[in-house]
Amino acid sequence: MIQPFVSVIVPVFNDSERLKKCLSALEKQTYPQQLYEVIVVDNGSDEEQDTKGVVNQFSQAIVVYESRPGAYVARNKAISVAKGDVIAFTDADCIPATDWIEKGVANLLSVPNCGLVAGQIKYFFKEPDKPTTVEFYDSLMGIAQKRFIALNYGATANVFTFKSVIDQVGNFDETLKSSGDSEWGKRVFAAGYEQIYADDTCVAHPARSSYAQINKQMRRITGGWHDMRKKEGYSGFGLVKDIVTLDLKPPVKTIFRLFVGQQIFPWAEGSAKGIPQKLEFLYVMVFIRAVVISERVRLYMGGDSKRA
């Protein structure tokens, strides 16, 4: 079987240190070097980040620039210059396994009419054997690709597709600062393409370790939800319904599993240890719901959604 040329797309915004680790991993791929390129899209990083200087250290990578804010705008810029028949997406804070491209391409080619492969995202902690409760929560609730595929999309931290699929269904929605991968993936599904989860196509991702990071993430995600709902005619009734049925609904089953020591979420293995961790885990859940409610209200009152 002829191996296709692959364009790997990596958007970055003020994250040059982690970008360096990502590019180092992409430089060491088992896939033939003459058959892939890495396109880094700088999305308006501060000058001292020196994205170009970082990219120039790696022979497989080039850098392009997109001044309009938003990771999906940046990805579209890279798509416009990509040479590959296969397009692979990851993020600057991810560390792909050495066989990531090889496995992603193999999975994409193995399924007839495949339009999207969502690979595994493994979380790692600052102290591998002693994750904080916030890190532990993020590792369970984070980017659950197997669950996302059941909802007809994959997170662009680890996605493979064909350029021909993008040509047919269109680029990412540039009005969205979050959840654009969900919106795009559902277009791929609606066009009749197969979508698969690939456990062996793996990138590592750092778990968020602080309440500030979780706060920022949830405000960004809530903004993405809001922007998509606004396109559908989001009303005050819809806002109240979301708050009452989603944010204020007690997670009784989750709390029960948490305190009896069972697996907390059906899609991710893991149980809390000891009363202090269980109580803080519960606090994280309450904290996130409070953040989401406040952001829903802020956005409905005319606030702008936030970028990454």
Regions found by a protein language model. Name each.
Residues 1-28:
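N-proximal low-complexity "stem/linker" segments adjacent to membrane-targeting elements
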Residues 23-65:
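Acidic donor-binding segment of Leloir-type glycosyltransferases
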Residues 49-52, 66-82:
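Glycine-rich, basic loop-to-helix element that forms the pyrophosphate-binding segment
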Residues 87:
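Short aromatic/hydrophobic "clamp" motif used to bind/position activated sugar donors
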Residues 99-131:
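Conserved donor NDP-sugar-binding/catalytic core segment of glycosyltransferases
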Residues 119-120, 134-151:
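Short, flexible, basic/aromatic active-site loop/helix in glycosyltransferases
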Residues 178-184:
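Acidic donor-binding loop at a coil-to-helix junction in glycosyltransferase catalytic cores
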Residues 219-223, 237-308:
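Non-catalytic, C-terminal membrane-associated alpha-helical segments of glycosyltransferases
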